Amino acid sequence: MSYKPIAPAPSSTPGSSTPGPGTPVPTGSVPSPSGSVPGAGAPFRPLFNDFGPPSMGYVQAMKPPGAQGSQSTYTDLLSVIEEMGKEIRPTYAGSKSAMERLKRGIIHARALVRECLAETERNART
């Protein structure tokens, strides 16, 4: 394999509309984080939601009308535990993002366990 030098970046010509790498960009023309045209009024929306339990990378299925609450909660718990199992090895290898996903999964699993226990107690009373 031979070494090939990196070609220099193309410089902008005086008539071009795109600034070169060394040209300062005026602050009024910096694009918004949402990718819209500046001043268009489209608000910035993050790609994730901080409210509620984490999704752990899977989409929760819609519950059918006749489904029992405890069965679907138990199924959700099993899928969360399965997803958490995939994060163990990367966490040991030092992955910070896997560690954060594992933490969120533990929090989500604890909430689901509480739901399952509450459902069991309700069923025991009847």
From Swiss-Prot:
<dbReference type="InterPro" id="IPR017266">
    <property type="entry name" value="DOC_1/2"/>
</dbReference>
<dbReference type="GO" id="GO:0005874">
    <property type="term" value="C:microtubule"/>
</dbReference>
<dbReference type="GO" id="GO:0070507">
    <property type="term" value="P:regulation of microtubule cytoskeleton organization"/>
</dbReference>
<dbReference type="GO" id="GO:2000035">
    <property type="term" value="P:regulation of stem cell division"/>
</dbReference>
<feature type="compositionally biased region" description="Low complexity">
    <location>
        <begin position="9"/>
        <end position="43"/>
    </location>
</feature>
<dbReference type="Pfam" id="PF09806">
    <property type="entry name" value="CDK2AP"/>
</dbReference>
<keyword id="KW-0963">Cytoplasm</keyword>
<dbReference type="GO" id="GO:2000134">
    <property type="term" value="P:negative regulation of G1/S transition of mitotic cell cycle"/>
</dbReference>
<feature type="region of interest" description="Interaction with CDK2">
    <location>
        <begin position="64"/>
        <end position="106"/>
    </location>
</feature>
<comment type="subunit">
    <text>Component of the nucleosome remodeling and deacetylase (NuRD) repressor complex, composed of core proteins MTA1, MTA2, MTA3, RBBP4, RBBP7, HDAC1, HDAC2, MBD2, MBD3, and peripherally associated proteins CDK2AP1, CDK2AP2, GATAD2A, GATAD2B, CHD3, CHD4 and CHD5. The exact stoichiometry of the NuRD complex is unknown, and some subunits such as MBD2 and MBD3, GATAD2A and GATAD2B, and CHD3, CHD4 and CHD5 define mutually exclusive NuRD complexes. Interacts with CDK2AP1. Interacts with CDK2. Interacts with MAPK1.</text>
</comment>
<dbReference type="GO" id="GO:0016581">
    <property type="term" value="C:NuRD complex"/>
</dbReference>
<comment type="function">
    <text>Acts as a component of the histone deacetylase NuRD complex which participates in the remodeling of chromatin. Inhibits cell cycle G1/S phase transition by repressing CDK2 expression and activation; represses CDK2 activation by inhibiting its interaction with cyclin E and A. Plays a role in regulating the self-renewal of embryonic stem cells (ESCs) and in maintaining cell survival during terminal differentiation of ESCs. Regulates microtubule organization of metaphase II oocytes.</text>
</comment>
<comment type="similarity">
    <text>Belongs to the CDK2AP family.</text>
</comment>
<dbReference type="GO" id="GO:0005634">
    <property type="term" value="C:nucleus"/>
</dbReference>
<keyword id="KW-0539">Nucleus</keyword>
<feature type="region of interest" description="Disordered">
    <location>
        <begin position="1"/>
        <end position="48"/>
    </location>
</feature>
<keyword id="KW-0597">Phosphoprotein</keyword>
<protein>
    <recommendedName>
        <fullName>Cyclin-dependent kinase 2-associated protein 2</fullName>
    </recommendedName>
</protein>
<dbReference type="GO" id="GO:0005737">
    <property type="term" value="C:cytoplasm"/>
</dbReference>
